[in-house]
């Protein structure tokens, strides 16, 4: 029997029954427990959501900027009041440790919503003088109805990262969470309604990407798609969005990010960064620094320091507040990660630790994989080329700076990169040469609301967070005014 009641769709400011009558299950990856049956949206439900969003958006856009700002700030307050409740639900659905979801997932999502709530009154156009009797002014107008398609690793945070700028700019959003982790996004919809967001401005449709996601990308009344997920799926979403009605897109896609540790680096700091960049959230972070480049002269010392820190990882029940490493998000994903680990062994990478499923006692009921470190890796290995999205670190040895940067850039991805060094000139020189949209010097992983995040190459299109993102949820209307006579040539 499921722990929670059957989960409905959220359309027009309330829960509604899916017309399909079909459901799917969401599972606690820590123990295999069925958390809930979740209703599967149909094409008819997509139409209902779009019509509701069209109507709600008109009401929302007609409000003053200060009115919208106050309502979004109210939603921020509710999110923070309900932080622990939402964190507990996120932990059940994702398997993330409670200590992590309490301090990161809802907190960082609320921060982004607060940031954009403050920017609502600052959305403004320009006045451009042409001559004494004529000028141009511009208006930034909302796009209308936009759609967000989320990933399973940060469900509520991603929903907030996408909905915050969209709603701040006066749009309505239809959001499709991942089938794997749909629960907290439905709670976010409740919170928006409680805060005073008009009915229809934020709708949640649960179901598969192949169906619901496809219907959203094809719909002619949806003006923009914001997608987070794998690169192969992102290409399909982008193609569908373009071929249907030339929709705007934001794509936050895969990564295989390099972390370069230079010979002068503080190795204790470097090891701390490398372990965080690979094992936080059980390695299920798109920006993880999974290709760790270490200078040959420092390899043995660095590996020893990494192993020392891995031994301190507290793998356990996510509900235990002392746990800082939980299961993977699902059993199918666990099998995928284990497959990559076997590939690393077969291709003769040297295994330093981990490399297996954890099955001791109660862990045998969950999707646990031990923190895994491979060394003596080569650039052509599958574990080095492909995104694993799990707790697997690959250590690669290099001999000089040019080699490290050339190899770091030898990838189809360009999401993130980082360097560890005490030489300020070298740090900036290297970062300027690395082909990645998000870079860190002597740190890793923080993505504050003010910071635009997104990738180069096949890691994405557009940005999330920061000032630049808000502009991409608006369109510019240019208006010329003539105060003098009009001279016709006819």
UniProtKB/Swiss-Prot annotation:
The modification Cysteine sulfenic acid (-SOH) is found at residue 286. Pathway: Amine and polyamine biosynthesis; betaine biosynthesis via choline pathway; betaine from betaine aldehyde: step 1/1. K(+) 1 binds at residues 26-27, 93, 180. Keywords: Metal-binding, NAD, NADP, Oxidation, Oxidoreductase, Potassium. The keyword NAD applies. It is an enzyme of class 1 (oxidoreductase). GO terms for molecular function: betaine-aldehyde dehydrogenase (NAD+) activity; metal ion binding. Its EC number is 1.2.1.8. The active site is at 162 (charge relay system), 252 (proton acceptor), 286 (nucleophile), 464 (charge relay system). SUPFAM superfamilies: ALDH-like. GO terms for biological process: glycine betaine biosynthetic process from choline. NAD(+) binds at residues 150-152, 176-179, 230-233, 254, 286, 387. This is Betaine aldehyde dehydrogenase. It comes from Pseudomonas aeruginosa (strain UCBPP-PA14). The gene is betB.
């Amino acid at each position: 029997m499921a722990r929670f009641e059957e989960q409905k769709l959220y359309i027009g400011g309330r829960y509604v029954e899916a017309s399909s009558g079909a459901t799917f299950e969401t599972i606690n990856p820590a123990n295999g427990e069925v958390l809930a049956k979740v209703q599967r949206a149909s094409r008819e439900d997509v139409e209902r959501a779009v019509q509701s969003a069209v109507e709600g958006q008109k009401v929302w856009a007609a409000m003053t900027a200060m009115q919208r700002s106050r309502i979004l700030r109210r939603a921020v307050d509710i999110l923070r009041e309900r932080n622990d409740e939402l964190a507990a639900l996120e932990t059940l659905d994702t398997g993330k440790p409670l200590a992590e979801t309490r301090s990161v997932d809802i907190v960082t999502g609320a921060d982004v919503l607060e940031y954009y709530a403050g920017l609502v009154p600052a959305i403004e156009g320009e006045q451009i003088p042409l001559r004494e009797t004529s000028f141009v002014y511009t208006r930034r107008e909302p796009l209308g109805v936009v759609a967000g398609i989320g990933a399973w690793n940060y469900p509520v945070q991603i929903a907030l990262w996408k909905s915050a700028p969209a709603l701040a700019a006066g749009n309505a959003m239809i959001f499709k969470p991942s089938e794997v982790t749909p629960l907290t996004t439905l709670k976010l919809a409740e919170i928006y309604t409680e805060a005073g967001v008009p009915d229809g401005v934020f709708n949640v449709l649960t179901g598969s990407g192949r169906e619901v996601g496809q219907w959203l990308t094809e719909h002619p009344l949806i003006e923009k798609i914001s997608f987070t997920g794998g690169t192969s799926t992102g290409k399909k979403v982008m193609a569908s969005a373009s071929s249907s009605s030339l929709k705007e897109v934001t794509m936050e896609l895969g990564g295989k990010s390099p972390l370069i540790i230079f010979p002068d680096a503080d190795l204790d700091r470097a090891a701390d960064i490398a372990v965080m960049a690979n094992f936080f959230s059980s390695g299920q972070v798109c920006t993880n620094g999974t290709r760790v480049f270490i200078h040959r002269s420092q390899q043995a010392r660095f590996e020893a320091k990494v192993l020392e820190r891995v031994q301190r990882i507290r793998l356990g029940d996510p509900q235990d507040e002392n746990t800082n490493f939980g299961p993977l998000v699902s059993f199918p994903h666990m099998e995928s990660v284990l497959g990559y680990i076997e590939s690393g062994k077969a291709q003769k990478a040297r295994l330093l630790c981990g490399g297996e499923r954890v099955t001791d006692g109660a862990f045998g009921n969950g999707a646990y994989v031990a923190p895994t470190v491979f060394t003596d890796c080569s650039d052509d290995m599958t574990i080095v080329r492909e995104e694993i999205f799990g707790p697997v670190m690959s250590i690669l040895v290099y001999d000089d700076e040019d080699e490290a940067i050339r190899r770091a850039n030898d990838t189809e991805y360009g999401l993130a990169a980082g360097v560890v060094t005490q030489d300020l000139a070298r740090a900036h020189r290297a970062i300027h040469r690395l082909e990645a949209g998000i870079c860190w010097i002597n740190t890793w992983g923080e993505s504050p609301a003010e910071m635009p995040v997104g990738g180069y190459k096949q890691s994405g299109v557009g940005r999330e967070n920061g000032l630049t993102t808000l502009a991409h949820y608006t369109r510019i209307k240019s208006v010329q005014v003539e105060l003098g006579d009009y001279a016709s040539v006819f």
